[in-house]
C-alpha cells in the first residue's frame, strides 16, 4: 500500500529518486503515465496491467473507453528503478506535470502520484475545504 508524502528532487538528467519504502513494491517494474490535475501516476507493473486490461475490454464497443485506452497507452512509459532507486522521467512527462527540481511524491493507496511541489501546494490549498465536505458526503458509505 502506498501512503505518505515525500519530497525528492529531480536532477538535471530528469531522474527522480523513489521513496525507499516503496522500492520493493516497484522492483518488478513500474509504469509512469499522465494523470489528472497535471500530475503523473506511477503504478506497479501488475496493477497497471489490470487497469489496462479493464480498459481494453471496455474499449471494444465504447468510443470514450477506446479514446481513454489510446491516451493511456500513448502516455505510458515503462521504467525499472536503478540501483539508487531512481527512475528517469521523459521530457514529455516532465512538461505535462510542469516539474521543477522540487517534486512531491504522494501515496494514493494502489499507486503513487508525482507533482511539482508548487503545484501540489496550490492544489492542497484549493481543495482544503472540499476535504471536509467529501468526508461527510462522498465517503459516508465507505467510512
UniProtKB/Swiss-Prot annotation:
Stretches assigned to the SpoVT-AbrB domain: 5-47, 76-119
Signal peptide annotation: none
Entry-linked PROSITE patterns: SPOVT_ABRB (PS51740)
GO MF annotation list: DNA-binding transcription factor activity; transcription cis-regulatory region binding
Keywords: Cytoplasm, DNA-binding, Repeat, Transcription, Transcription regulation
Gene3D superfamilies for the chain: Transcriptional regulator MraZ domain
Listed SUPFAM superfamilies: AbrB/MazE/MraZ-like
Gene Ontology process terms (BP): negative regulation of DNA-templated transcription initiation
Location within or outside the cell: Cytoplasm, Nucleoid
GO cellular component terms, A-Z: cytoplasm; nucleoid
Keyword Repeat (UniProt): yes
Family recorded in the similarity comment: Belongs to the MraZ family.
Assembly description: Forms oligomers.
Identification of the protein by name: Transcriptional regulator MraZ
Species the sequence originates in: Mycolicibacterium smegmatis (strain ATCC 700084 / mc(2)155)
Amino acid at each position: 500500500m502506498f501512503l505518505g508524502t515525500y519530497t525528492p528532487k529531480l536532477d538535471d538528467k530528469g531522474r527522480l529518486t523513489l521513496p525507499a519504502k516503496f522500492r520493493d513494491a516497484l522492483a518488478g517494474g513500474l509504469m509512469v503515465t499522465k494523470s489528472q490535475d497535471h500530475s503523473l501516476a506511477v503504478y506497479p507493473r501488475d496493477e497497471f496491467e489490470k487497469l489496462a486490461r479493464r480498459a481494453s475490454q471496455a474499449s471494444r464497443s465504447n468510443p470514450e473507453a477506446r479514446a481513454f485506452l489510446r491516451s493511456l497507452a500513448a502516455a505510458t512509459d515503462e521504467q525499472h528503478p536503478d540501483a539508487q532507486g531512481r527512475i528517469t522521467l521523459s521530457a514529455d512527462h516532465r512538461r505535462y506535470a510542469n516539474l521543477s527540481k522540487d517534486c512531491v511524491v504522494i501515496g494514493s493507496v494502489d499507486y503513487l502520484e508525482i507533482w511539482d511541489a508548487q503545484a501540489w501546494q496550490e492544489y492542497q490549498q484549493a481543495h482544503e475545504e472540499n476535504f471536509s465536505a467529501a468526508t461527510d458526503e462522498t465517503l459516508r458509505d465507505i467510512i
